[in-house]
Amino acid sequence: MKIISEGETKLMVPEESTLSKKDTVFYNPVMETNRNISVSVVQSFLDNFKRDEFLMCDPLGGSGARGIRYANELEFNGDLKVSIGDINPSAVKMIKENLKLNELENVEVFHEDANVLLSKNFKVFNVVDLDPFGSPVPYLDSGIRASLTKGGLLCMTATDTAVLCGAYRKTCIRKYNAIPLKGDKELAVRLMIGYAVKMASKYDIGLKPIFSHVTDHYARTFMVTERGAGKADSAIENLGYIRQDSEQKSFKAFEEGYEKGYAGSFYLGEISDKDIVQNSLETAKNRNYSKRAVDILELISKESEIEQVGCFDIHELCSFIKKLVPPVNDIMDNLKENGFKVSRVHYNPYGLKTDAELSDLVVLISEYHSKKY
């Protein structure tokens, strides 16, 4: 064992963490950025929370890193309590050791299956954070029901991004009841949100995303639960299908039904709230969280100013029109000079969000080459 620091929290973790042994406690240091962002986003949500008690659940605790950081680093004037569960007895033991290490008394630990823990706590938690290895689908139904408190928050990670991005089409259809679209990684998180919205709607619950990102090998989203059939209907109105023709996307409303050649359904509405993103960015900066977490939040802050589903991949676009790829910064400057909004995206070094049309980009790239060469 070794002791490390993440954010403002000390953690005892295995020297080597692996999923190959049944009794091994899993800790992934690569996900520190994920946890930095998560604490920042939940803090932004908590800043507007009006009740005296705030109850959270991390039902897939592992080493306890996520739940313990919530318990230790979130600032709240009322009573903040965190429930952490894991089916692995070795994990439960480590979680308890990490609680002692940080002298925390606001955490309850459960040696229990995640679905059992969540099902026992119907409508109890203000926040449920599903962070599995693989797909969140097996835990989603019980996670939704456990976070049905008024204005609750459902956080969800999927590490099966190859499935969500279309590498395993049949698996995606089977697990997420949707046809994936290859290419744009943002569509992975939109597909995941779309599935969650459909799952929640059967309980007359609407899910409203307030923050989403696709980083490394995972997709992550934070969704507010809103009670009422009307809220569920409003959430479903944001679902739709996408058809990709060359570099151009066509859209079709969910209520119109599926049509051959389209993929989805995807959540086509806003997936990150501008105020939440900005507040999360300020929190991450003020707490000196990792530079990478701050950089991702800064990019998402700029992205959220532009209403575009997905992005334009300049590398793919130039390949399609048979032009050399100009420096991305030059393309951005040209777009701004022509009165368009533009931002890089956090998940693709060649990706741009802009209110320009595809035809505008083609013209600007062609003009760039005619002047340059």
Curated annotation (Swiss-Prot):
GO terms for molecular function: tRNA (guanine(26)-N2)-dimethyltransferase activity; tRNA binding. InterPro entries: SAM-dependent_MTases_sf, Trm1, TRM1_arc_bac, tRNA_met_Trm1_C. Residues 2-365 form the Trm1 methyltransferase domain. Its EC number is 2.1.1.216. It is an enzyme of class 2 (transferase). Keywords: Methyltransferase, RNA-binding, S-adenosyl-L-methionine, Transferase, tRNA processing, tRNA-binding. GO terms for biological process: tRNA N2-guanine methylation. S-adenosyl-L-methionine binds at residues 35, 66, 86, 113-114. The keyword S-adenosyl-L-methionine applies. Signal peptide: none annotated. The keyword Methyltransferase applies. Belongs to the class I-like SAM-binding methyltransferase superfamily. Trm1 family. Dimethylates a single guanine residue at position 26 of a number of tRNAs using S-adenosyl-L-methionine as donor of the methyl groups. This is tRNA (guanine(26)-N(2))-dimethyltransferase. It comes from Methanococcus maripaludis (strain C5 / ATCC BAA-1333). The lineage of its organism: Archaea, Methanobacteriati, Methanobacteriota, Methanomada group, Methanococci.
